A protein has these predicted regions:
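Helical scaffold of the NTase/Pol beta-like nucleotidyltransferase catalytic core
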Residues: 1-29
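Conserved NTP/Mg2+-binding pocket subregion across the NTase superfamily
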Residues: 1-5, 68-142
Length: 142
């Protein structure tokens, strides 16, 4: 799945996956956007959903800027309140520019989604499948 990405994107995604797999507080890593819809090129951003164990959600949300800084040379990051999504961290990495969106949620929060994500890793595939099956993705009415 990751092998179809441009080198910069693939390298970042692989590094993120390894980092999150080694963190027992993380339940799953999901991908969305052009990663699943197609049309991905060297100018595309990466859209990730980081599913967190609810026991650690507040802790990780409080540390998400610092966490993003461990993923590479973070040029700038800001939260997504301006797009109505405060759980979103919008990141720009460099020196070769890479836009990465990290959305931090718990498994229960997967009920509200705009697309069916790709699963990059999960600690409990059955629980993830059950949660995804409860609700279908839909765009909000604007």
């Amino acid at each position: 799945m990751l092998n179809t990405l441009p080198d910069l994107h693939r390298s970042f995604a692989e590094q993120l996956k390894l980092k999150l797999q080694s963190d027992s507080r993380i339940h799953s890593l999901l991908a969305g956007g052009s990663f699943i819809h197609g049309g991905f090129d060297q100018y595309s951003d990466l859209d990730f959903v980081v599913v967190i164990d609810p026991l650690y959600y507040d802790e990780i949300m409080a540390q998400r800027m610092a966490f993003a800084g461990t993923l590479g040379h973070l040029l700038h990051a800001f939260t997504g309140e301006h797009v109505g999504e405060p759980r979103l961290l919008i990141c720009l990495f460099g020196p070769e520019l890479l836009h990465v969106d990290l959305k931090f949620i718990t498994l229960d929060m997967l009920t509200q989604r705009v697309e069916e994500p790709a699963v990059l890793f999960t600690r409990d595939n059955d629980a993830l499948k059950r949660q995804l099956a409860k609700f279908c993705a839909h765009w909000p009415n604007m």
